[in-house]
A protein has these predicted regions:
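Tandem CBS (Bateman) regulatory domains
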Residues: 1-13, 51-81, 87-96, 116-148
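Short, functional N-terminal and low-complexity linear motifs
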Residues: 21-26, 37-42, 56-62
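The conserved cystathionine-beta-synthase
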Residues: 16-34, 81-99, 106-107, 124
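A glycine-centered beta-loop-beta connector
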Residues: 30-33, 38-54, 95, 103-118
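Generic detector of intrinsically disordered, low-complexity, polar/charged segments
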Residues: 45, 101, 110, 131-134, ...
Length: 148
């Protein structure tokens, strides 16, 4: 089975913002970099995550001002995490259970990366079609997702 560390975004590539920046500024960073979330920090300690869904539900949905509202007020906290050796199936199940699309990835309890639904879809869609559609396709899918 494929562990999430295979397709995670390493921590040094993950974007983090200070808890005091405005939601508008965070949204612009997300738009400009083509990502759906940023981690939120307080004195370089990760205290949460802001996703595009958080912005829709907790800012737009509540009629708040994006320039006057800090990311701390719309973030999800704590970041829900999964061990790097868990499988893509485990990550999918956790995201479904928690109704989220982003997970922190840990090694020995320390955050080492992030994964999103988009990362999982990209990973699976980039597998050679002959692996998925060919004679051994079922075996390959079992290796990726595990047995039901």
């Amino acid at each position: 089975m494929v562990p999430v560390k295979t397709f995670m975004i390493p921590f040094d590539k993950v974007i983090a913002v200070d808890r005091h920046i405005s939601v508008r500024r965070a949204a612009k960073i997300m738009k400009d970099t083509g990502i759906g979330s940023v981690l939120v920090t307080w004195d370089r300690v990760i205290i949460g995550i802001v996703t595009d869904t958080d912005i829709c539900r907790r800012l737009v949905g509540m009629g708040l001002d994006a320039d006057q509202t800090s990311v701390e007020h719309v973030m999800t906290s704590p970041v829900i995490k999964i061990d790097e050796n868990k499988t893509i199936r485990d990550a999918n199940a956790m995201m479904a259970r928690e109704h989220i699309r982003h997970l922190g990835v840990t090694r020995d309890g320390n955050l080492v990366g992030m994964i999103s639904v988009r990362d999982m879809v990209t990973f699976v869609s980039n597998l050679p079609k002959k692996w998925i559609l060919g004679k051994g396709g079922t075996r390959i899918l079992e290796q990726i997702y595990g047995r039901p």
